[in-house]
Amino acid sequence: MTDILNKILATKAQEVAAQKAAVNAEHIRALAAEAAPVRSFIDSIRGKHRLNLPAVIAEIKKASPSKGLIRPDFRPAEIARAYENAGAACLSVLTDEPYFQGSPEYLKQAREAVLLPVLRKDFIIDEYQVYQARAWGADAVLLIAAALEQGQLERFEALAHELGMTVLLELHDETELEKCRNLTTPLWGVNNRNLRTFEVSLDQTLSLLPALEGKTVVTESGITGKADVEFMRARGVHTFLIGETFMRADDIGAEVGKLF
């Protein structure tokens, strides 16, 4: 199986270089400083937990490398409103264009349509992208342990926190724990999809739970309905990042509602 992650990261490096040439670092920092006030991503999740509800991070995703086009009828603002009305805690918006057909415009449209906090879902490899996320209005950023070295994880987390954003740290297996040991974010995601093969197993989250005691654990990928949610909640996981299941639904709001 081709190492998909390495291919994505190589493309991302070229993309970031082009973006820096178009909008220099000083300007992107200024735009980040002028952005709308941050909405607390982690507080929104904890608010659902206090009500004994699953906290759903609902994803706005048009396509993926493994599945191709997922939702042809793709209207980010409309999708965001459906998610908010159905009880989602937060939004996740893909901004990667080459592999996920995402766009910063989708993030902006979604955030303007609702009051929910929004995560920039992308492959962050440079501090420029952290400033960029805030400039676009993101309230949180994803840091993928498999894509970054320890020093990068620590620098990017510190910068995100300095800008007021929540960090969702994404792990896949126990080999990534050591380089994350100094991170302070309370929000630790486990991607049930192996980013090197794109195969999915909920066992990934379960296998890491003992090492993540005291963290707010987010299970990502492979959650297909209420049975999966109840299965994970019975094992102490109450936060769910879900995209494809919702994106394939004719009635997105109704699909989200089935989880509660």
Swiss-Prot record:
Highest rank taxon of the organism: Bacteria
Going by the UniProt record, its keywords in alphabetical order are: Amino-acid biosynthesis, Aromatic amino acid biosynthesis, Decarboxylase, Lyase, Tryptophan biosynthesis
Catalytic reaction equation(s): 1-(2-carboxyphenylamino)-1-deoxy-D-ribulose 5-phosphate + H(+) = (1S,2R)-1-C-(indol-3-yl)glycerol 3-phosphate + CO2 + H2O
Could you tell me which pathway this protein works in?
A: Amino-acid biosynthesis; L-tryptophan biosynthesis; L-tryptophan from chorismate: step 4/5
Query: What's one Pfam family here?
Result: IGPS
Entry annotated with the keyword Lyase: yes
Root EC class: lyase
The GO terms this record gives for MF are:
indole-3-glycerol-phosphate synthase activity; phosphoribosylanthranilate isomerase activity
Q: Which GO terms describe its biological process?
A: L-tryptophan biosynthetic process
Known EC number: 4.1.1.48
- Indicate whether Ubl conjugation appears among the record's keywords: no
Which HAMAP family does the protein's record reference? IGPS_B (MF_00134_B)
Q: Which family does it belong to?
A: Belongs to the TrpC family.
Instruction: Please give the name of this protein.
Output: Indole-3-glycerol phosphate synthase
Which species is the source of this protein?
Neisseria gonorrhoeae (strain ATCC 700825 / FA 1090)
Q: Which gene encodes it?
A: trpC
